[in-house]
């Protein structure tokens, strides 16, 4: 770290009017790419390439500054779409929903924000969600977020929707402006210290601070009134709380003292709205809103400090290059030397790192949404709980595969082996054979042993020998490490965390269950032999996914089979004619194969979650305090055999979607059917080769010529890689939509 203050330097960071705005240029298909613009637009292949390469900025130009500007501009377009989407969500809440009714009775009324038009009899889909409202039950969690943020009327949702539209148009304008009018120079994109300072202090610091401010001044008082049963129409409007301190002081007396306790360090005065309670609010079943406000204030302070750590114009603070180059251990050669150059000149390397982090974070979010439900009445809305978990797991899986994809693109396009010697990346590449062969051994070990435990149980069960099965009732395989972690956390309050009154999550154990309106919100989750078995399946599928993706990255440039692989590019079908056995070796193919195993991994996780929660957590509680779970605790006995998974999970729980015809859930029945079809359609692309289709196309074209109806654009069979891409897309889309229909029909019917 350097501490010396010199005169601040002023740099010119933008070019004015670098590229003129031309509608004629935009109208020319493929104008952005040399290859496509020169190509032959008379074939369907050209159309496919147009779509495949439209966003592959590397293939349009080799100029890093131009690529950076395109990416930057595209980000604004992406933000515009996000604002447009959000606006649509809020508009639906304002125009087509029962939000105000739900707000008055969230335990008995389901959230709905979509009403189907009465055409061809499809109004059957508008089921009764309670309170006399007929519509489609939604499971996105928007109602819960809106209540937590203090929205009390549909008018407020309208205003927010209009605001989001204004922001969407602003983002579109910014995307055009920062490409055509004031485009940043390459140096601006590479100024990582400035970027870190602004992102940490601005986005995360001030963002969290403003959210904390909103929660304290608007959300908390409004939620206080709602929890007390005050009619939403009687509650003062948000701006009244902000402008009139006396209103807040009536709810939180310390507000009357203003900032005095802050400056006199008498901070405990603020504990009534910046609390540290832990656990769940017994009225709403969500985390305490005052805990959440406290959390965002603390996070804001951390990030505001972090955003002042890096050296920019004033010659004081950390430099990223120095930190990375100092990062060497006794056994790691040059360590991170050269990493700074990689991350400031290869956006693929940068993106890969960010996708890996974001993907992991997204999966962590999935697990926190049920174990620490952040919004009021979220925990008892089982459909939303299941949807949020499933959604965040899928998103996390895709992001992690994306991380491997861009790591491989970096290796092929941006990695320069001549300048890298003995740094960490080089050392990993030099012992890649050891890494991959060991990982392969681990996959084989995990696969045979985890599956073997199930097969043993199926065999013993089939032969009528329950006493010889691995189960909680016979040969126990208790997950002792997981139980140990649970116990540590359950016992933490008063021992390792003396300030806390309760553990971070009820799932650890130790606490009483929380029930809202006769429904279980959360209770301690027991783990047993069944969980031990399925967790080893998780370990197996995750390790295989990693094996495929990591092999793709480490062998992206070369292998014993194809030493010059880097020259063939990121995606290629085979190493040319005359070299048999070299197909499916490109880095792209590893991403393709990795996607299937990612799908396997996430499927097992969401199946496990869905069944475990229905069996051991979700359910109703009687006046006598007796809990009745949805599937009556059958997970521990049934999920220990493959047959049990098929019979008591897939088949038994599919009854709702299969029998949905003629009811308001029938759309899920149709989706279940249609998505199976989309999935099966993918196999047509995955199981047949290019030549088969070219032959077929030629005879179809002959017939068209005979009838003089041949198109001007020549049809061509998909290339091998395009066929695989279309195949994996439909495979995943069909599989995910099938699961979605199965889960939602089930949980809406029984939850």
Swiss-Prot record:
Its EC number is 1.97.1.12. HAMAP family: PSI_PsaA (MF_00458). [4Fe-4S] cluster binds at residues 574, 583. One of its GO terms (molecular function) is chlorophyll binding. Disulfide bonds: none annotated. Chlorophyll a' binds at residue 676. It catalyses: reduced [plastocyanin] + hnu + oxidized [2Fe-2S]-[ferredoxin] = oxidized [plastocyanin] + reduced [2Fe-2S]-[ferredoxin]. One of its GO terms (cellular component) is photosystem I. It comes from Zea mays (Maize). This is Photosystem I P700 chlorophyll a apoprotein A1. It comes from the Eukaryota. One of its GO terms (biological process) is photosynthesis. PANTHER family: OUTER MEMBRANE PROTEIN, OMPA-RELATED, PHOTOSYSTEM I P700 CHLOROPHYLL A APOPROTEIN A1-RELATED. PsaA and PsaB bind P700, the primary electron donor of photosystem I (PSI), as well as the electron acceptors A0, A1 and FX. PSI is a plastocyanin-ferredoxin oxidoreductase, converting photonic excitation into a charge separation, which transfers an electron from the donor P700 chlorophyll pair to the spectroscopically characterized acceptors A0, A1, FX, FA and FB in turn. Oxidized P700 is reduced on the lumenal side of the thylakoid membrane by plastocyanin. Its main location: plastid. The gene is psaA. It is a multi-pass membrane protein. The PsaA/B heterodimer binds the P700 chlorophyll special pair and subsequent electron acceptors. PSI consists of a core antenna complex that captures photons, and an electron transfer chain that converts photonic excitation into a charge separation. The eukaryotic PSI reaction center is composed of at least 11 subunits. Phylloquinone binds at residue 693. The chain crosses the membrane at residues 71-94, 157-180, 196-220, 292-310, 347-370, 386-412, 434-456, 532-550, 590-611, 665-687, 725-745. Keywords: 4Fe-4S, Chlorophyll, Chloroplast, Chromophore, Electron transport, Iron, Iron-sulfur, Magnesium, Membrane, Metal-binding, Oxidoreductase, Photosynthesis, Photosystem I, Plastid, Thylakoid, Transmembrane, Transmembrane helix, Transport. Chlorophyll a binds at residues 684, 692. It is found in: Plastid, Chloroplast thylakoid membrane. Belongs to the PsaA/PsaB family. InterPro entries: PSI_PsaA (IPR006243), PSI_PsaA/B (IPR001280), PSI_PsaA/B_CS (IPR020586), PSI_PsaA/B_sf (IPR036408). It is an enzyme of class 1 (oxidoreductase).
